[in-house]
């Protein structure tokens, strides 16, 4: 019985020669599998199938070709054979002829192992495999064992090459992920080669034989110990040290059936058989094959089993070049996108800056004349005592709540933005108890903010026709105006079609109240002069020192608020423009305010700074006379204060008799000079010709002179000259000549002439 066993072993060695075609891919795997093949034949003889092996050698030669054409179909049938009679087919194919080769396999494996080790390092191994066939006959037994190793390789090769080994015949070429395909079709003979790394190339060639090879793996487990002794263990050990550690760890796992599941779920049945065989011998040889396999499989996928090693480097270079190109393309695209984004951001920033500039110039139209159609002839005098009959049209469909955005503060800061609900709470629901008064633009309510600050809330009747943006621009311009004689704005509110302005609360009411309210003690002369001077300063600031210039358009005594010390504050400046821009309809009821309107406004509809000057002249007449601008209680023809005062003003300037004009409440408790100056100022302000009216700055200087001491020291104009004018003119000419250097004059002549002039004057 022992002799027949030996015979099959020899036949196994010969079978490799017949299976030379697979050797093309075997260069890397041969070293790893000679031992495996030897072991497999030993197990096969144990099965007692030597006669069948003789028949299989012939079959083994054609199978390598068939795998190229259609490896998947052939591997699929072997799977059943593996499960059923794997040992019979395997011993039949390799062992019949190689009775002499047993010694050779032992010798050949060493060369095969060295050959296998170099191929992983360099691509040239393909030629050596062709030369190695003589030696490979010994290693050829490895191919039967190769199919078993493949099941293990998929885990290691899946990253670089595993797909290539199954792909080389037909499936590995299309995609690197072909292993799944082979796993379903063959019993894992094709797919496992990639995991085994080295066995994978031979497996690609053997795919035709895998039925028999796959069957071999099942019997090898018992025979493997013998084969390990035959192939040089040192060669097998060499591969193990290099990178086999991971593969070896996998090998122990492979002896157990888990490795096949790793390869694929379909081939677990065939895989268990190869796994035991692989665990016995290949573990040592497989590590080198694993090292070699990574380069070889990709090449097999590209060309075939013949060009596995050389093709691998090329695909690697192609991948590197393609990856470099892709990286460059990505970098270029990213740079282009970044540039596009930067340009878009720049365009947006420029647009925003331009829009801000446009908004900043919106408030510059305060000086523009108001069209005649926008108001009736009597509208100027009733700007703050008008009622809007037009429907309130809102350009917002939903309530908007605004919270305070900035603190009230210095010049250039934005006002606070209040919510409507906040103002409702502050004014106690805009109750009548908090009502301070009603003007042409709406009612004014007293309110207390959460920080206990007292404010005056003005509900504008202008509605929402202007639009939020325009209204905000106007309010922002008004809120930037700060002067000690101007009422500062605290904030505003926009809610649907509601427009509200919030001002500092002034507790001492207004000038109209103190002059004309019943039961009031009236104002003394000093207080009246103080109020007139303060209002003049505030109005002059709006006309000349404010940018953009603001025309109040509604100067009257009710818009001059008084603090507790009777410090005058001009209020409601700029609101007339808001109303006119919103096309607010002005009612015809102008009683009490009609007398402030300038005559040119009624005739031409134009408003200028001189229109405010005329209105301020009417306020001065109120302070002087204590009468209302329009008083229906006066006799017919004397209802208008301006028309009644004109003849009296001219008479007072000529005769300096002020009794007819002075307020009866004053009696004679006034300073004559100050009364005269105030009468002159009032007469100049109410002139019919707008061009002949003084500027507000001139009126301010006139009031300032009332408080200053006489700079003339009691001397009349012309009496202060103590030097001869002729002599003085001569000295001036001399200085001019000296300055321009036209002629040379000595200083002696200048001093001599000056002394002479002094002596003459004495």
Curated annotation (Swiss-Prot):
Subunit and interaction comment: Interacts with KIPK1 and KIPK2 (via its cytosolic domain).
Superkingdom in the source lineage: Eukaryota
Record function comment: Could be involved in the negative regulation of root growth.
Pfam family, one: PK_Tyr_Ser-Thr
Low complexity composition-biased segments: 13-23, 41-57, 276-305
Protein name: Proline-rich receptor-like protein kinase PERK10
Keywords of this entry: ATP-binding, Cell membrane, Glycoprotein, Kinase, Membrane, Nucleotide-binding, Serine/threonine-protein kinase, Transferase, Transmembrane, Transmembrane helix
Recorded GO CC terms: plasma membrane
Organism of this sequence: Arabidopsis thaliana
PROSITE patterns found in the cross-reference section: PROTEIN_KINASE_ATP, PROTEIN_KINASE_DOM, PROTEIN_KINASE_ST
Glycosylated sites: 37, 278, 319
Listed CDD domains: STKc_IRAK
Membrane topology: Single-pass membrane protein
Cytoplasmic side: 350-762
Recorded name of the encoding gene: PERK10
